[in-house]
Amino acid sequence: MFEINPVKNRIQDLTERSDVLRGYLDYDAKKERLEEVNAELEQPDVWNEPERAQALGKERSSLEAIVDTLDQMSQGLEDVAGLLELAVEAEDEETFNEAVAELDGLEEKLAQLEFRRMFSGEYDSADCYLDIQAGSGGTEAQDWASMLMRMYLRWAEARGFKTEIIEESEGEVAGIKSVTIKIIGDYAYGWLRTETGVHRLVRKSPFDSGGRRHTSFSSAFVYPEVDDDIDIEINPADLRIDVYRASGAGGQHVNRTESAVRITHIPTGLVTQCQNDRSQHKNKDQAMKQMKAKLYELEMQKKNAEKQAMEDNKSDIGWGSQIRSYVLDDSRIKDLRTGVETRNTQAVLDGSLDQFIEASLKAGL
């Protein structure tokens, strides 16, 4: 005979946790808002304002993720209780196992929704930008920067996020000097915000004919895409705007016009650049949007001692602000803030970052 009580206790536990989340996430208000958004999106003239329509579509996805999951929990727990009753009456182990499997799936869904409580910051739900910058060390550091780029692109792809490379500066021999990636998806900034910092690589360098061990550094800096109406004042006199030809690997010109744009905020030294469009005007708009976002993030850091002036430290890529160490010879990757460690280095470099990200979010970093 199978054990019924532990399963009944799990159903009770999940019901209580689900009820707590309904209150915490304001289920009733979100359900009402979802109905309003759906009604607006059904209007025939909604696409007369494409930006508003896109914003509504994004809001609908975010609301559905909460409302639909809680609805599924409620129905699913009822179904499991019914299956369990059937299993007991018929003394059917197969039906019992089916009920347990369904319960496992519901618990996983609920755990994912509970994890969203970590995302309480004002811009956690926003899309974000990720800057990766190679440290000193030439080709080895530039190759490491490209490995980090690949790691984050793989991670984003696995989460179903979209990515767009805004600007990329090729390395002299291999790798990249720097890259800016836009990451588009639900809570993209919330997921990635604790990845800001210096990443240290230790390995036998493929670029050293003697096969010696090298240590390299690259930095990651994550900042949210902020609304156009965010109150960030930029004095035009504080900006230097340069235009240049967009170029690809090996110096081949992507086009012959000076369409690429670089903006420098002179008081802070912040730089943004964009070359992914043939239109100089569009590239300038994108670079300005990034500058606004960077200045906003810098302002938030000044107000928050734990994130003190990360951008100011970007030029000093070294031991000081390290967050993670990747020692490939010893097959060991360790987060220096949370102590989380793994020996499956290839999986991490292929984008398996959730164990590190979740630990840092739970630690309130």
Curated annotation (Swiss-Prot):
The lineage of its organism: Bacteria, Pseudomonadati, Pseudomonadota, Gammaproteobacteria, Enterobacterales. This is Peptide chain release factor 2. PROSITE patterns: RF_PROK_I. Keywords: Cytoplasm, Methylation, Protein biosynthesis. Belongs to the prokaryotic/mitochondrial release factor family. The modification N5-methylglutamine is found at Q252. Its main location: cytoplasm. It is found in: Cytoplasm. GO terms for cellular component: cytoplasm. Gene3D superfamilies: 3.30.160.20, 3.30.70.1660, Release factor. Methylated by PrmC. Methylation increases the termination efficiency of RF2. One of its GO terms (molecular function) is translation release factor activity, codon specific. Peptide chain release factor 2 directs the termination of translation in response to the peptide chain termination codons UGA and UAA. The keyword Lipid biosynthesis does not apply. It comes from the Bacteria. The keyword Protein biosynthesis applies.
